[in-house]
Structures are given as C-alpha cells and as structure tokens.
C-alpha cells in the first residue's frame, strides 16, 4: 500500500447532508443519538426490526430498512452506523441491494470513537511507524487488513472494514491449516478486562471447563458481578479474580467512573468523575501465577502498559495473545512496537473479533 491512497473524509462531511438515517438499534444507539442530537435524524433502520413494525426512540421511528428506504433515503440523506458489529456487511448491503451511494455511508463515529479512534493528523504523522508495523506482520492477510483499517480511519467508510478471513472464531486466529492462536484445554489464561464474566464463561465453555483463569477487573460494580458469577457457577477452583487494573506499575491510580455501554475504563486524570483503584503489574504476581499460556487484553487503551508490566513473564512463557488495539488511534503502532521490544522473535498478526472489523486486535503466536 502507498500511504495514503484514499481521499481524506472527516466526520464533519456529514453536515453536507440535510438528513441522517442511523443504522442499528442496539446498545450503541443512545451514544450515537447523543453525539448527533444537533443533526436532523429522520429515522433509525435496524435489520432485526420486523417488517411492518415501527418502534420509537426519542420520537424517531425505528424500522426495518426495507420499510423505510423509499420514504427516507434520497441524495441528501447520509447513513451513519449506530452499531459496532457488521458495519461492513451492512454497508455492502446498502450499496448492492438498496443502491445507496458509497459517499452517503459513514461508519460509527460517536464522540467517543471520534475522539480516540479517528485521528487523521496523527496517522499522517506516523506513516513511517505504520510502514514498520506492516513489515512486522506475519502474513499477507494481516497486512491487507491493516491497509484497510488505515483507509477506514481516514475516510469513515465502513466498506473498508472487510474482515480478515483468518479470524475463524472469537479469540481464534488461523495461522495455517494446522496452527491456530486460541485458548486451549489446560491453558493458564490471563483475562485482562474481565468485565462481568462474559469472557470467563467463554473460556470455560471452549476448554470444556479445563482451564485456569486469572481475571482482572478494576470497576467495583463489574467486579461484584464477576465475583457473583464465579460463586454461582462454582468456579472458585479454576478462576481467580483481582479487583485491579493491569499496568506497568503496581500502585493506586485514578480511573474514570464515566462508563458507557461497553464499561469503558479510561485511566485518565482529566475525566471529571474519578475512582481510586488498584493497578497491578503482572510480573509482580509471578509467585501467584504458575504459568501463562494465553493472554487476552481488552482494557480500554491501557494494553501497551499492561504488556510493559508483564514483559518478564511474557519472555519466560511465550504465551499466545489477543491484544485489543482499537481504543486509541496510536494503538496500531504503539502496541506492536512494545510487543516487538519484549520479544522480537514472536509472530504478530492483525485481526478483529468476528464480524467486527471496526475493532482491530493483535494476535501473537
């Protein structure tokens, strides 16, 4: 890829349109509605809404797109995604089956995403670093996906979010026909960003209950639900939980209590509402954790610091890893640089969660 090979398109270009249709009525809808409250939102399309059925959200109709395309879509209407998953598939459907022009379609870009995920100036400043990351990636599918993620971030165009075909399941990357990055039976798993236990249930299910999990969740409310899950499911012998964030120092830190639908945890001293929580350096727990086989890090932009705080254990055990890289724009180059510094011999791939090309993740094999 010759960086850049696309025409820059910022969120402000939505203002060129006199009307907006949002697409998606799931958990992100409220956030997108708030971000676009000053715009003329005329309808909300959702594929899960039954044909002929109409619901209301803040006096805006929610309907199946087949019922609303003719009524609400014209050349002066933009479609803005209000859903995280399936943005690529939705955009392809809009172009192919509803004949909506590509320039009318915008990816999800609520204020939170716009602030942290899209930053064209930062990307242009770090094109050389992105070229270096591209060279680090271990297969052509990862490189192609990186190219498209950069195009997407510069254009707000979900048609660039074509999935990496090597993602064959949640936390599963296909390196070759016989080699996968994935959690396995008997693995010792680090679950960074355990939330309320959804990932715990996933790991237990996909290892037939034969794994040991060390969970880290800083928010008290989430931690209590996680604790309740472990007790209710009688997982105490297999799951150890820490009411702590992961970082590069073991200390108390100020963490934002301003959580969205995804329970964001922004270690950011500039947020208005704070909680003091424990931050744990993983290397300081080496006497408590027998070994590490698989690491999942999804900790709202603190992934690079958690890696720095675990470098001794990562060098020693060489675990497979899934490291989220979508919370901050510079995750795309900062995280692989940290990984490469810890162990330059590890293979690095770039993928995403199934049907969520919007959220890049590094896989380490």
Language model features: what each stretch is:
Residues 1-41, 47-365:
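Phosphate/nucleotide-binding beta-alpha loop and adjacent structural elements of enzyme active sites
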């Amino acid at each position: 890829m010759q960086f850049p090979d696309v025409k820059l398109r910022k969120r402000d270009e939505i203002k060129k349109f006199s009307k907006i249709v949002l697409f998606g009525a799931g958990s992100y809808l409220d956030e997108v509605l708030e971000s676009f409250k000053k715009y003329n939102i005329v309808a909300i399309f959702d594929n899960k809404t039954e044909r002929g059925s109409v619901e209301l959200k803040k006096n805006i109709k929610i309907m199946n797109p087949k019922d609303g395309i003719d009524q609400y879509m014209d050349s002066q209407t933009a479609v803005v995604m209000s859903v995280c998953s399936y943005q690529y598939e939705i955009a392809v459907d809009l172009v192919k089956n509803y004949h909506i022009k590509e320039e009318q379609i915008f990816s999800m870009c609520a204020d939170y995403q716009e602030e942290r995920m899209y930053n064209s100036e930062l990307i242009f400043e770090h094109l050389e670093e992105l070229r270096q990351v591209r060279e680090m990636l271990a297969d052509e599918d990862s490189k192609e996906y990186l190219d498209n993620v950069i195009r997407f971030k510069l254009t707000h165009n979900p048609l660039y979010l074509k999935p990496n075909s090597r993602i064959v399941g949640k936390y599963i990357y296909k390196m070759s026909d016989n080699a996968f990055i994935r959690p396995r039976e008997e693995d010792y798993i680090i679950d960074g960003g355990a939330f309320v236990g959804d990932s715990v249930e996933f790991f237990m299910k996909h290892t037939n209950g034969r794994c040991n999990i060390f969970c880290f969740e800083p928010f008290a409310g989430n931690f209590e639900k996680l604790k309740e899950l472990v007790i209710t499911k009688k997982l105490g012998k297999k799951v150890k939980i820490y009411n702590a964030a992961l970082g590069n120092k073991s200390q108390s830190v100020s963490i934002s209590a301003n959580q969205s639908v995804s329970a964001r945890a922004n270690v950011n001293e500039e947020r208005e509402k704070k909680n003091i929580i424990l931050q744990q350096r993983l290397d300081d727990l080496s006497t408590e954790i027998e070994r590490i086989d698989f690491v999942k890090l999804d900790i709202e932009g603190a992934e690079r610091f958690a890696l720095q705080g675990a470098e001794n254990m990562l060098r020693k055990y060489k675990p497979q890893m899934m490291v989220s890289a979508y919370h901050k724009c510079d995750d795309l180059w900062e995280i692989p640089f940290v990984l490469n510094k810890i162990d330059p011999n590890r293979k690095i791939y770039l993928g995403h969660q199934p049907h969520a090309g919007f959220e890049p993740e590094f896989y380490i094999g």
